[in-house]
A protein has these predicted regions:
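Solvent-exposed beta-strand/loop surfaces of large extracellular or lumenal domains
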Residues: 7-10, 59-85
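Beta-strand-rich interaction surfaces with strong enrichment in secreted/lumenal proteins
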Residues: 11-15, 24-25, 36, 72-74, ...
Length: 976
């Protein structure tokens, strides 16, 4: 006989000894049970038991999921640790009540469920089975069948955003796995290509990064500790798998030992096979990238950037690692700081993903408690090992994992979204943070940016190109040189793309998929141009690749492969040991066909910094006319030989990237000498290459006010850049940087009416500048707005300014305006209706109410007027809005009307909205629910509508429940 019990705390008499069964039923979201739908949802369902001393076995619709302990005759209790069991695809019945049954054995009756009740989790949602269950003693199993009709008790169907803390399961779910040979045989290659496995498990596990030292040896980073940091306890998390932990980890050797490691592999006899395999550092935690340089190895070991000294190069650290940086976030361990790589300028560059934040400090330099450099979300950072300067290089991007400098020093990354093959980063660039959801990705770091620079458009591209590189190796096909190659772990292939110039950046066009593998566990996550001219591919080798699945312990930490890809007809380079070469031998390598040789030569020359080499490099740069000159410039800079005289001369160099890098390298000093500044200003006036002009703008952002604004003024007069994807935004960022403390200097530029007439200013600057001043909202800012209006030469320019002014005031009441601005506003020929409303014009208010109710008018105009009328508290607005919400069909207008109605407190409004709820368009119902939840009196009508069935429970989100609970009293009691 089944009887009711409460889980986790059973009622009296329901703690029997011996064997028995608990059961309940659950109806899951349809996509959890839809085979042939999106695999991620079906494959990401797990069941968790927090703690139970009893031996137990878990069954779903009669199918065993797992268990702990053992039953008589050899009975053993569970270890009381939390358990997670995978729900296999097909185990859940769509649209039915699935039977969850747990067989238990309690020797003494003390083994009831502890902590919380069992729970079932999908990728983003979960359901907690705390409450009523059924219990039956004995060993006879329940029917093991899903029900069509909801059972009378112990039935659960309320799911909410997943937030229960996660942990690493004792048993991991690996999924299908082929041997290295079997997987290799499944590759499909474009004609003329060859691929081979150079390393595989157990020598390689979970590889996320590949690098090479000056001897051409391969360094591999094994991110085996992922996804859980060693020794830390998760105390909370959100549905995006961002977690908080109980403490900040210390750097090695004071950390909790983990499973990640760094290894080095060498091909001694030159036959292409790695003969020696050494572990350089092990027992690491969140170590995802290792990079040789400066007589040691740099390891990105979040939250620290570590340096392991190894001056004698014996592959044994000389001592404990030095923490050069601290404070990188690890809330989401698939978004941590990563991808460290040497820039051509001698800086160490790294990336940060989309769902972590950082507050970076420099141990030993910054005082205890220093604020550090804070940033939330994706960005590119850099650090100089000699000066120990740290800065954010570019803001935004995708969930960046890996960085790539091409042959001209451009910086790229992949993207874990669609529509692009990646991002092209320029200095001081500001890009979209992965997506526009501030709840997931954080708000814009600069609220006055009013825009961002785009990713490289590529048409209809499915997500995603996790990692991209610019192919540049002599053993690769000639047609591939300089093209982007993307690693797509979701689709088990590599994609080759052509870059098409688009002003200062690019669009991309896919050429094809030259490398495919039908093995579902092939997951390419990183690629590198190798010293021998081939290409190496790091394969994470996982059946399950989504990070949420990894947090669910669907991961294989024992697998991993590395492949070599090359053209069949191309020989590999044998001379890959540059360590013993003299400076005289390294300089000619600056024109080597392999990027690795060129960049390694630059790095070695820079680290040696021999004074005698400086003159030779100056001569090299002057003598060369192409890319070899650029590499010479980088080397000259790194040895300390790029002075103003040399840089000024290079502004005339025929290769545009030499000109751009001369500006950038001197600009890194954050102030230019008077002579060099004047030379750059003249360059800005005449420069014909958009990437050089883009770099001038990027450098200007870093410079003092007069130099910055002087360069921006020249660039704003270059009509050719009006449609450029980068330069207009860069110019705006130069101006915006000085609006706060040097407003007068910015406005002085616009005392010249000819600047208004420049297409760059007309299209990209005027509206933003007016909006920036008005949004800041101080009296001096409004006086600045008046000056802009006064100096504007035409009505069209004033219209541009007023568009920015109106945007700045959206969502707020009009503040007191200075007389100077009021005078200019009165002089406007035909001020916009929305502005007249905000100024309190009674005739305009009446006209606005008519427009608001006119369905034939553009929805955008009506929404603006609703907001403006609400902000000024227009008379008659309540009645107009009430009529609107009862008749309107446009979702945007209706949602704006409901939001504006919240300022009025009449109970009749709640009655009207609740009564009309069924007639609202589905897309507007969240706004209606938010309206009803906003006031206690209306909340009672919301709860009554739910109780009567007129409003579906699923329409009330967890966030809304939290609002209801905040009202307290009877509303809170009913909500709970």
């Amino acid at each position: 006989m089944w009887r009711p019990v409460a889980v986790p705390g059973e009622v009296e008499g329901a703690r029997p000894a011996g064997t028995g069964w608990y059961r309940c039923w659950v109806k899951v979201p349809d996509n959890w049970a839809t085979l042939g739908g999106r695999d991620l949802w079906v494959e990401s369902v797990t069941l968790t038991i927090d703690s139970s001393h009893a031996a137990h076995a878990v069954f779903l619709n009669g199918k065993r999921l797992g268990g702990a302990g053992s039953f008589p005759p050899d009975a053993k209790p569970s270890d009381r640790l939390a358990k997670r069991y995978k729900v296999p695809p097909g185990a859940l019945a769509k649209g039915r009540w699935n039977e969850l049954a747990i067989k238990v054995f309690n020797r003494d009756g003390s083994g009831r469920f502890r902590g919380s009740g069992p729970s079932i989790q999908g990728y983003f949602l979960e359901c907690l089975f705390s409450g009523e269950w059924e219990y039956q003693p004995g060993t006879a199993p329940p029917p093991g069948q899903a029900l069509e009709v909801k059972p009378a008790r112990a039935a659960y169907d309320q799911f909410h955003e997943a937030s229960r803390v996660l942990f690493e399961a004792q048993t991991l779910v690996h999924g299908e796995r082929l041997s290295p040979g079997e997987s290799l045989a499944r590759f499909e290659l474009e004609d003329g290509l060859a691929i081979e496995t150079v390393l595989h498990e157990p020598l390689v596990t979970q590889p996320t990064y590949l690098s090479f030292d000056a001897r051409g040896r391969l360094w591999v980073s094994h991110y085996v500790q992922y996804p859980y940091p060693a020794g830390l306890r998760q105390i909370s998390r959100d549905k995006y798998y961002r977690a908080k932990y109980d403490r900040q980890p210390k750097p090695p050797p004071h950390h909790t030992p983990g499973r990640s490691r760094v290894t080095v592999h060498e091909d001694i006899d030159g036959d292409g096979s790695y003969d020696t395999h050494k572990v350089f550092a092990d027992k690491l935690s969140l170590a995802n990238a290792a990079l040789p340089g400066h007589d040691g190895i740099w390891v990105m070991h979040t939250p620290h950037l570590l340096f392991y000294p190894d001056r004698n190069a014996d592959d044994i650290p000389d001592g404990d690692p030095v923490a050069h940086l601290a404070g990188f976030g690890f809330e989401d361990t698939h978004s941590v700081a990563n991808g460290i790589t040497w820039g051509p300028d001698g800086w160490l560059y790294g990336a940060q993903g989309s769902t972590v934040s950082c507050r970076v400090t420099r141990p030993g330099i910054d005082p205890p408690g220093a604020a550090g450099v804070h940033f939330e979300g994706c960005m590119v950072w850099r650090y100089h090992p000699r000066s120990r300067e740290f800065e954010i290089f570019a803001e935004g991007g995708g969930n960046v994992f890996g960085l790539e400098f091409d042959a001209d020093g451009r910086l790229f990354s992949g993207h874990n979204g669609g529509g692009t093959r990646g991002f092209h980063y320029v200095q001081s660039g500001l890009y979209l943070k992965q997506g526009k959801s501030p709840g997931k990705f954080g708000p814009p770091d600069n609220p006055f940016a009013f825009g961002e620079m785009p990713m490289m458009p590529g048409g209809s591209i499915p997500r995603f190109s996790h990692n991209v590189i610019a192919v540049n190796g002599s053993a690769m096909p000639g047609a591939w040189q300089g093209r982007l190659l993307g690693a797509d772990p979701l689709h088990h292939h590599l994609v080759l793309s052509k870059r098409v110039v688009r002003g200062a950046s690019f669009t991309t066009r896919d050429i094809g998929f030259p490398v495919k593998n039908s093995d579902v566990a092939f997951r390419p996550v990183y690629m590198a141009n190798a010293p021998d001219g081939s290409l190496l591919i790091a394969d994470f080798y996982e059946r399950y690749i989504a990070h949420g699945q990894h947090y669910q312990s669907q991961i294989d930490p024992t697998s991993g492969r590395i492949y070599r890809l090359q053209a069949k007809a191309k020989p590999r380079v044998a001379d890959t040991d540059l360590r013993a070469k003299t400076d005289e031998q390294l300089i000619p390598l600056l024109s080597h066909p392999n990027k690795w040789h060129r960049q390694t030569a630059v790095r070695l020359l820079g680290q040696r910094a021999n004074e005698a080499t400086t003159d030779k490099l100056r001569k090299w740069v002057k003598a060369e006319t192409g890319r070899a000159a650029l590499h010479g410039l980088w080397a000259l800079h790194q040895v300390g030989g790029l002075d103003d005289a040399s840089a000024t001369g290079l502004l005339e160099h025929p290769y545009p990237h030499v000109r751009a890098w001369a500006v950038r390298l001197r600009g890194d000093e954050r102030e230019l000498s008077a002579g060099f500044f004047n030379a750059v200003r003249r360059l800005a006036q005449r420069e014909g290459h958009p990437e050089v002009r883009s770099q001038i703008a990027g450098t200007a952002i870093r410079l003092p006010r007069d130099q910055a604004l002087g360069l921006a003024a020249e660039l704003l007069r270059r009509d050719a850049d009006v449609d450029d994807p980068f330069i207009p935004m860069q110019c705006w960022l130069v101006l915006e940087r000085h609006c706060e403390n040097d407003r007068a200097a910015v406005l002085e530029l616009f005392s010249d009416a000819t600047l208004y007439r420049q297409p760059m200013a007309e299209r990209h600057i005027l509206e933003r500048l007016m909006r920036r001043l008005a949004a800041r909202g101080r009296q001096d800012d409004f006086i600045g707005c008046a000056a802009l209006l006064k100096n504007a030469p035409t009505q069209g320019h004033r219209d541009k300014l007023m568009a920015g002014f109106s945007k700045a005031l959206e969502g707020q009441a009009l503040p007191r305006l200075p007389d100077e601005l009021l005078e200019q506003l009165r002089r406007l020929d035909n001020p916009p209706l929305v502005l007249r409303v905000r100024l309190g014009d009674s005739a305009a208010l009446g006209q606005a109410l008519q427009v608001i109710g006119d369905a034939a008018r553009p929805a955008k105009d009506r929404v603006e007027l609703i907001r403006a009328a609400s902000d000024v508290g227009a008379a008659g607005l309540q009645q107009a809005l009430l009529r609107l919400v009862q008749r309107e069909t446009d979702t945007g207008v209706l949602s704006a009307g409901l939001l504006a109605l919240q300022r009025f407190g009449d109970d009749s409004l709640g009655k009207a909205v609740a009564g009309h709820y069924a007639n609202f368009p589905e897309a507007a119902r969240p706004a209606a629910v938010s309206f009803l939840a906003s006031r206690p009196a209306w909340s009672r009508r919301l709860l009554a509508a739910v109780e009567s069935g007129r409003l579906a429970k699923r329409d009330v989100t967890l966030a809304t429940v939290e609002v209801l609970l905040g009202h307290g009293g009877e509303v809170a009691r009913q909500s709970s």
